[in-house]
């Protein structure tokens, strides 16, 4: 299993809305994430800094990257553009983090 972590931002006035939209996420999106090998996906909110910290375990980089080209992911990204900064393709602005410590 490959562990990934990344940081995104949420608009200061959208903390509650961001959380509402994720509880629960669309069943179709959940199915796509699982079918593409995502496990133990979690997102944490740092309210003071409007930061989102996400962790996910994936089976392969190729399958994980393929999620972005699915119709449901494209619709989800568009749905989220009013609550968080987005790139021109509507994907969330994010930075992948480097793992520096792991205790199994």
Curated annotation (Swiss-Prot):
HAMAP family for the chain: L_rham_rotase
Job description of the protein: Involved in the anomeric conversion of L-rhamnose.
Assembly behavior: Homodimer.
Residues reported to bind substrate: 18, 41, 76-77
Enzyme class: isomerase
GO MF annotation terms: L-rhamnose mutarotase activity
GO CC, one annotated term: cytoplasm
Catalytic activity: alpha-L-rhamnose = beta-L-rhamnose
Pathway: Carbohydrate metabolism; L-rhamnose metabolism
Places the protein is found: Cytoplasm
UniProt KW keywords: Carbohydrate metabolism, Cytoplasm, Isomerase, Rhamnose metabolism
Protein EC: 5.1.3.32
Lineage of the species this protein comes from: Bacteria, Pseudomonadati, Pseudomonadota, Gammaproteobacteria, Enterobacterales
Coiled coil feature spans: none
Keyword match Cytoplasm: yes
Protein name: L-rhamnose mutarotase
Domain of life, source organism: Bacteria
Pfam families linked to this entry: rhaM (PF05336)
PANTHER family in UniProt: L-RHAMNOSE MUTAROTASE
GO biological process, alphabetically ordered: rhamnose catabolic process
Family designation: Belongs to the rhamnose mutarotase family.
Active site: 22
